[in-house]
């Protein structure tokens, strides 16, 4: 065997031996993604918050955003319920991300991030957004309800996940450990 053939075979063997480690290396470099559509109930009244969002989380920041409608759900009011505010939101500083387990490419856990809300009227304000994802069918629960918690200190408003009778949440959240990027 010639020296060049030996080196080629040796390099190929090293590459093949490294393949099992590749998914772990690739996974360590990817961000966790989040997606949700949820309804929150005001902790001190009949207001509701419909909110959607998606994005990614890296060790320093949450990147993403979505849309929201804040409305008065007083049963005495006719449909359509009056909208109190509507607009978009943008994720900001990461407070914490705790992944408690995975099931395939899905993950359960709790994401806490700072966010900026922008109203169509031009008003903007800060909030803390907590996205809580449980994967009950995988036996993974954070101990908190599925959904999104929003605290808006400037207005003294707090929203918690709303539920159907029986405790099933109005909305879904999901984290993923896989992010496809075109190109």
Language-model features: locations:
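Extracytosolic low-complexity repeat regions of secreted or lipid-anchored proteins
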Residues: 106-165
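Compositionally biased, intrinsically disordered low-complexity segments
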Residues: 12, 86, 134, 153, ...
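Aromatic side chains
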Residues: 6, 34-36, 89
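N-terminal export signals
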Residues: 5-24
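Intrinsically disordered, low-complexity, compositionally biased regions/tails
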Residues: 16, 68-70, 89-91, 96, ...
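N-terminal segment immediately downstream of the Sec signal-peptide cleavage site
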Residues: 25-79, 161-183
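Predominantly extracellular/secreted and cell-surface proteins with exposed
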Residues: 49-132
């Amino acid at each position: 065997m010639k020296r060049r053939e030996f080196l080629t075979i040796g390099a190929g063997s090293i590459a093949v031996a490294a393949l099992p480690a590749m998914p772990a290396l690739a996974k360590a470099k990817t961000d966790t993604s989040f997606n949700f559509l949820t309804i929150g109930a005001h902790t001190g009244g009949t207001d509701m918050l419909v909110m959607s969002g998606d994005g990614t989380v890296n060790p320093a920041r949450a990147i993403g955003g979505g849309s929201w409608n804040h409305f008065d759900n007083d049963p005495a009011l006719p449909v359509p319920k009056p909208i109190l505010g509507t607009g978009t939101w943008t994720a900001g500083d990461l407070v914490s991300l705790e992944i408690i387990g995975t099931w395939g490419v899905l993950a359960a856990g709790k994401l806490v991030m700072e966010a900026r809300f922008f109203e169509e009227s031009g008003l903007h304000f800060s909030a803390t957004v907590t996205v809580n994802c449980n994967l009950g069918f995988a036996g993974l629960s954070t101990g908190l309800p599925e959904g999104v918690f929003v605290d808006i200190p400037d207005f003294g408003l707090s929203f918690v996940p709303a539920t159907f009778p029986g405790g099933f949440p109005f909305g879904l959240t999901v984290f993923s450990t896989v992010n496809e990027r075109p190109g």
